[in-house]
């Protein structure tokens, strides 16, 4: 023990990096010398014994060099201790909340939101300008493939303006109406928004809808006209539409708005100064009890559920003990960080910031992360008022999904479950079909949402599914005052079976806003009238643009109304809609029968005006995909006991008279009668074999 000479026998100072038993003394004993002390969420045992900065632990002499302390877990930061900050965090910590700006980009689909976001990230140095960094915030393969934004994504930026650093938080939102819930949640973390308009297309349907959503939330709007470099661009017309439609203070000479080309980078440098000058900074008290809002969440295989949060009051650090005001569940914070643009751990999140946090041990169930929930420190529940939260999006389209091969059921079940963990707007329950076997009934926000889910399943998991025709929920009002919501068409009651017990049927309607050039207005009105729509208003603005509003049944939307609008207007019409409640309607259940046996996979609730058209379409199309049998196959479309349409598949012909002499008519007649009786008996007891591929081809649009 000569190396310890002069020390007291009770303890020794552990600074012996050369001793083999203490192979990582800096990591084990000095919280200040470990750069990763804030990102080790797995061992919470030292939280009750935080060490001061640059502390030297004194350990008993007899254990020195025994190897026992190699297993001591790394100390984690708590709200009582400090940890070394990176250069990035030191720069962030020096920025007061008055120089924070939280904003989002809202626009109609394909008006250039993601491209503008890329230019802003490049301008602030958050990403480098390269071809690999296109659509950097569109992280899903389906987003890059389709060129649309499906999931709202966030990013923190640092920007130098007039000699001072500003902390900017950007949210790139979806433009399609199916993902409206993503846009609404994004508003909760923002103080303003860039209202983006395509200079060649002008104000579109979803521009109108997004404006009123943002206006209702009290967001400050900064008008931006994009794509000014296109040959068809007309910025003056776009500015006039912004002024006339929304009463924004913009002029045709461009004052009051920012004219840019996000693709070419023209005038993009003027956007962020406009954000700083016009959008107000957030407010918050770092010394008040923690009050944070859960904006979004996703599932991580290693960390469990990761939360995207907006901090309103207080400061949250790794090691803090927090509680959910919605569920009462208690957690220990394991890691906090920002999206820059990828997850970047930090030692703290402060008021006004938007970032992510995970727990240690991790939150295991995505259902425990309730969007709109409020979290605070344990013990502060009584003094912190919860936020009202968000309205849960309601599925508008339901489909039955089945594996193309029943042997793949379990693998497909795992893939669907994993996707629904990160897309909570999808509802899922088990289903069974006599024709297609075991499957699921899935609920989606719209037809595009359903299509995107199917693409993600194929791209991310290599799995394919067979989907039935989309259906909307219907409501049955009983005479005893009760009501039932039907999402599975096979469960829709038949009037003949429940005669006198049903008061009426109801279907969901939407308030649709359609923007279209005036020259196509007549076609659009006819299409809406044919879809059982009721016109509510019509407004002409500008030289050529018209906005018409209709009350339309949701059934029209799943019947490819969007595609029909595009076809009737040569691609110029745009559609936006919102839920408009239930309306009484004449509804019936249309079944497809094969030899008088209903095929449960092909069943739909329709309006009485559509029964004949759809029934004839079904029997004609299904006949093309059913193989001939040894007996006659009758395909029928029926409502209750009433047959709407019929097609017949003739049996294979076997010449039983081939070996007979031509002069023996009685024998010929006898054999033909016997064959006829045999086919009749076979038809009565035989089952029609319909391959899965036949159903798949029939169900394809």
From Swiss-Prot:
Organelle transit peptide: 1-29
Enzyme kind, highest EC tier: hydrolase
InterPro entries: EF-4, EFG_III/V, EFG_V-like, EFTu-like_2, G_TR_CS, LepA_C_sf, LepA_CTD, LepA_IV
CDD domains: EF4_II (cd03699), LepA (cd01890), lepA_C (cd03709)
Residue span of region Disordered: 23-85
GO cellular component: mitochondrial inner membrane; mitochondrial matrix
Entries under Pfam families matching the protein: EFG_C, GTP_EFTU, GTP_EFTU_D2, LepA_C
Statement: the UniProt record of this protein carries the keyword Nucleotide-binding: yes
PANTHER family xrefs: TRANSLATION FACTOR GUF1, MITOCHONDRIAL, TRANSLATION FACTOR GUF1-RELATED
Protein name (record): Translation factor GUF1, mitochondrial
């Amino acid at each position: 023990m000569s190396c310890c000479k002069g020390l007291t026998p009770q303890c020794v100072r552990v600074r012996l990096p050369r001793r083999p038993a203490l192979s990582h003394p800096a990591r084990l004993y000095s919280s200040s010398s470990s750069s990763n002390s804030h990102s080790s969420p797995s061992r919470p045992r030292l939280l009750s014994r935080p060490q001061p900065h640059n502390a030297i632990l004194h350990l008993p002499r007899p254990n020195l060099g025994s190897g026992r302390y190699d297993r001591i877990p790394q100390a984690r930061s708590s709200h009582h201790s400090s940890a070394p900050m990176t250069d990035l965090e030191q720069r962030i910590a020096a920025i007061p909340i008055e120089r924070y700006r939280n904003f989002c980009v809202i626009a109609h689909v394909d008006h250039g939101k993601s491209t503008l976001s890329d230019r802003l990230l490049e301008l602030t140095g958050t990403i480098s300008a390269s071809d690999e960094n296109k659509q950097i915030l569109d992280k899903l393969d389906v987003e890059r493939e389709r060129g649309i934004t499906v999931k709202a994504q966030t990013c923190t930026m640092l920007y130098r303006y007039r000699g001072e650093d500003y902390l900017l938080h950007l949210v790139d939102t979806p433009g399609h109406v199916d993902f409206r819930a993503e846009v609404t949640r994004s508003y909760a973390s923002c103080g303003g928004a860039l209202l983006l308009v395509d200079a060649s297309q002008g104000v579109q349907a979803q521009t109108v809808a997004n404006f009123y959503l943002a206006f209702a939330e009290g967001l400050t709007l900064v008008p931006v006209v994009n794509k000014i470099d296109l040959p068809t661009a007309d910025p003056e017309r776009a500015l006039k539409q912004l002024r006339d439609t929304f009463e924004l203070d913009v002029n045709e000479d461009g004052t009051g708005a920012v004219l840019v080309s996000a693709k070419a980078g023209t005038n993009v440098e003027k956007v962020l100064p406009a954000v700083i000058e016009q959008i107000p900074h957030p407010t918050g008290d770092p010394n008040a009890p923690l009050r944070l809002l859960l904006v979004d969440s996703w599932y991580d295989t290693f960390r469990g559920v990761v939360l995207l949060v907006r901090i309103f009051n207080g400061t949250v650090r790794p090691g803090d003990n927090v509680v959910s005001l919605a569920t009462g569940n208690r957690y220990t914070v394991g890691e906090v960080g920002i999206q820059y643009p990828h997850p970047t751990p930090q030692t703290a999140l402060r008021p006004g910031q938007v970032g992510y946090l995970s727990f240690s041990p991790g939150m295991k169930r995505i259902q425990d992360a309730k969007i709109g929930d409020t979290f605070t420190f344990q013990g502060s529940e009584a003094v912190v008022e919860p936020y009202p939260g968000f309205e849960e999006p309601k599925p508008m389209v339901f489909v039955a999904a089945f594996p193309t091969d029943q042997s793949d059921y379990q693998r497909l079940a795992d893939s669907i479950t994993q996707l629904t963990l990160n897309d909570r707007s999808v509802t899922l329950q088990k289903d069974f079909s006599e024709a297609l076997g075991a499957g699921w009934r899935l609920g989606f926000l719209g037809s595009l949402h359903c299509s995107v889910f199917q693409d993600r399943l194929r791209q991310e998991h290599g799995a394919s599914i067979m989907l039935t025709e989309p259906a909307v929920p219907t409501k049955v009002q009983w005479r005893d005052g009760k009501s039932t919501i039907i999402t599975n068409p096979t469960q829709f009651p038949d009037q003949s079976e429940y005669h006198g017990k049903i008061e009426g049927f109801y279907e969901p309607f939407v308030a649709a806003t359609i923007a279209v050039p005036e020259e196509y207005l007549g076609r659009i009105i006819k299409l809406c009238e044919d879809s059982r729509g009721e016109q509510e208003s019509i407004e002409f603005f500008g030289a050529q643009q018209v906005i018409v509003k209709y009350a339309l049944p949701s059934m029209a939307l799943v019947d490819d109304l969007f595609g029909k609008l595009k076809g009737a207007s040569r691609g110029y019409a745009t559609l936006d809609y919102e839920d408009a409640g239930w309306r009484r309607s004449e509804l019936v259940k249309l079944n497809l029968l094969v030899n008088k046996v209903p095929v449960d996979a092909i069943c739909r609730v329709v309006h009485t005006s559509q029964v004949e058209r759809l029934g004839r379409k079904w029997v004609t199309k299904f006949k093309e995909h059913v193989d001939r049998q040894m007996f006659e196959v009758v395909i029928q479309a029926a409502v209750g006991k009433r047959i709407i349409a019929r097609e017949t598949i003739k049996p294979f012909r076997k010449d039983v008279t081939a070996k007979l002499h031509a002069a023996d008519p009685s024998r010929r007649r006898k054999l033909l009668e016997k064959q006829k009786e045999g086919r009749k008996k076979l038809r009565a007891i035989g089952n029609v074999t319909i391959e899965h591929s036949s159903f798949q081809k029939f169900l394809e649009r």
